Amino acid sequence: MPITIGRGFLKSEMFSQSAISQRSFFTLLWEKIKDFFCDTQRSTADQYIKELCDVASPPDAQRLFDLFCKLYELSSPSCRGNFHFQHYKDAECQYTNLCIKDGEDIPLCIMIRQDHYYYEIMNRTVLCVDTQSAHLKRYSDINIKASTYVCEPLCCLFPERLQLSLSGGITFSVDLKNIEETLIAMAEKGNLCDWKEQERKAAISSRINLGIAQAGVTAIDDAIKNKIAAKVIENTNLKNAAFEPNYAQSSVTQIVYSCLFKNEILMNMLEESSSHGLLCLNELTEYVALQVHNSLFSEDLSSLVETTKNEAHHQS
């Protein structure tokens, strides 16, 4: 039966599996590829394969891509030729195939498209389709969805276009390539790693600070902020996260806002509609910024503001 996974708007349809068949499923795949890893790496590779074979809660597209890359990095140098990466793009479509081959057999094959993905393990298919769009919180008449693809320079799935559907049958998309190009330029200059370290701190801190502000609790000093932040970080399982009480906005949020603001079609739509304005632009910015953050760091911050608000009320 369909279940919601990943970022909350991916749907998965899969073959039903019993616990016994799932274990057998894992064993078959592991027996096929375990020799691709040296003894010191097999324990870690074993855990990644188990995650791949978890048909009850399959990984989303970004995690699939991450797992494939991790398995490649763990493999013995002499076996890396068994890992195949094929990326195709033209004016009409683009797709990425990630495969592990063993002679004529293909024990693992991952196919990633712009709006859906699926993967096969030992010729058993798990199909996951991006079928659900999201609604803006304040503007329920606007449906939004990010179309993603594999960005090789950044080594992640990256949002390529923002698709919007409005009441009255109006549909259009916003090109997000300027965001990607900005980050690729950093990578080419060798600045991306240092920037990402600061960006993650800013992204987490700014949303925690926003949640504290929206809670409307008075007399919160930096010590209380730090206490709230520590609890929120623990509850949301953000590994090795740091908090800065003075951060108000992340660089990604600024880059996304600039990209959307420069889109004439989007801005004309906002200006012509009496019910939409800069608040709508801010919500669109936050949606895209969350997708970009998830792409870069493989973590979902969408609940961070609400979690912080609840914790701030609890601490007051």
Curated annotation (Swiss-Prot):
Species, as recorded: Salmonella typhimurium (strain LT2 / SGSC1412 / ATCC 700720)
- Domain of life (superkingdom): Bacteria
Q: Which NCBIfam families match?
A: PRK09499.1
Q: Under which name does UniProt file this protein?
A: Secreted effector protein SifB
The entry's localization annotation reads: Secreted; Host cytoplasm
Which GO cellular component does the record give, naming just one?
A: host cell cytoplasm
**Record flagged with keyword Protein biosynthesis:** no
Q: Pfam families per the record?
A: Sif (PF06767)
UniProt keyword annotations, A-Z: Host cytoplasm, Secreted, Virulence
The protein's induction, as recorded, is: Induced when grown intracellularly and in an acidic environment; repressed by H-NS and induced by SsrB.
Annotated function: Effector proteins function to alter host cell physiology and promote bacterial survival in host tissues.
State the similarity comment.
Belongs to the Sif family.
